[in-house]
Amino acid sequence: MQPDFEPVIERKFHNYINCIEGVYHTGQRDMQRIRISIDAFNAGFKIKHIGEVLYASVKNEFDAVVDKCEVVIYTDPAECTRVRHEVAIPIFDKRDERLDTLTDESVDVYYSCILCQAFSPSHVCVVTPERLGLCGAVSWLDAKATNELDPNGPCQVITKERPIDENLGSYEDVDEAVQKFSQGALEHVTLYSIMQDPMTSCGCFECICGIEPFSNGVVIANREYAGMTPLGMTFPEMASMTGGGVQTPGFMGHGKHFISSKKFMKAEGGIERIVWMPKELKEQVAELSLIHISEPTRRRGI
């Protein structure tokens, strides 16, 4: 099987696990949360059943490309940590590096992604080379591979032949696609603005960016951050304002790698508008080699 298909299958785990009665899954990559209800546990549900569901679902849906499948579930915390750092994260980094030479201008099409509509029926991600899905797990190349595997699936081609405002990232083609895939709930979406018709969010975002009115800047909180933000809200409280497939000007969900993109909040001035991030997130962003930070921004400590 081609390695390009691995993230496609991996992201489908979200749907497969949520099809189990009494089991809830959210998140992606190495930031996932699975909840098992008391009723499911009392009915005899075991961890091994997750593996059985994944095995059967992968073999059923991807039989054209998957010849053999094996599911190994780790429950020992130390072993989970080892596998995460020695196996998973290096693989994720390699996937992200594939996009280093691609820009939004260098491709002819973008892709929609509606994998999360089970939670947010009106949410539609528009995936471009420089703006990955807000979950952080679906890049432009992943969406392309998903479309090749299943032309009628969750990732559909969006042309970009009729620009309205390229600074905002506004296209007639994108608006038409969003209207179609949101069943008419959305009419306009911009790709590079947090204030004017921002992209909607479901609940799987890696980060949330929100306007901080006193500084006229923005703060960004990542999912792992459990503290209070300068907005007086925690990440879950910000999520309640941002998710659900509703456009909320001034707030947007996004992947961590989008922060390093030149298209991040391009319409509002980009990363120089960031006034606060948790230390952990700042260190992660600093490791992204593509990020360009101007000298005035460096002096402010961003």
Predicted feature locations:
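Secreted, propeptide-processed cysteine-rich mini-domains
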Residues: 71-112
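Cysteine-rich micro-motifs
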Residues: 129-139
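Long, charge-rich boundary regions
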Residues: 146-198
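Short metal-coordination and nucleic-acid-contact micro-motifs, chiefly zinc-binding Cys/His arrays
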Residues: 109-112, 121, 131, 195-203
